[in-house]
Amino acid sequence: MMASILLTLFRRTKKKYKRHTDDQASNNQVPKTGQEHGRTSCRAPVENMNRLRGECLRMMEVLKEEMWRIYPVLLPQMELLDKECQTPELGQKTQMTYNWTQWLQTLYTMIMEENVPDMDLLQALREGGVITCQEHTMGMYVLYLIQRCCPMLPKLQFLKKLGKLI
């Protein structure tokens, strides 16, 4: 239940802050005098944008493949951490609505849906009261592990921060 709520919030955040990728200002430029008609000055940026789009798609596919490979390795570790969260005297789990395994599954699902998770989104969820401070720390740790195991994720996060991720 909590995982689906969190994924929905991530999707809304992505839609809300999605940037328009076409360069409308350069498409409306009038050709300068001395320039051939039929060739506009925005041709190079459009070609660069298409190349960037293709590169982003390639990087996303590589990230999905890396995540697909590392998920079976990380899952038993997260399950082990869930078991260690039990209190020794009562034998019950501590009160949390979101555990290690759920964080891994949520971040895995986001990556497979081509959403790039980052620390800023986790911080926004904590500040919005959606997750607790402890859950935020757990999510940051799981995201950090994924970043260490999937070298393409930090590159895509950097492009996202620059507003260049398509």
Curated annotation (Swiss-Prot):
The P/V/C gene has two overlapping open reading frames. One encodes the P/V/W proteins and the other the C protein. May counteract the cellular interferon antiviral system. Pfam families: C_Hendra (PF16821). Coiled coil: none annotated. This is Protein C. It comes from Hendra virus (isolate Horse/Autralia/Hendra/1994). GO terms for biological process: symbiont-mediated suppression of host innate immune response. Keywords: Host-virus interaction, Inhibition of host innate immune response by virus, Interferon antiviral system evasion, Viral immunoevasion. Residues 17-42 are annotated as: Disordered.
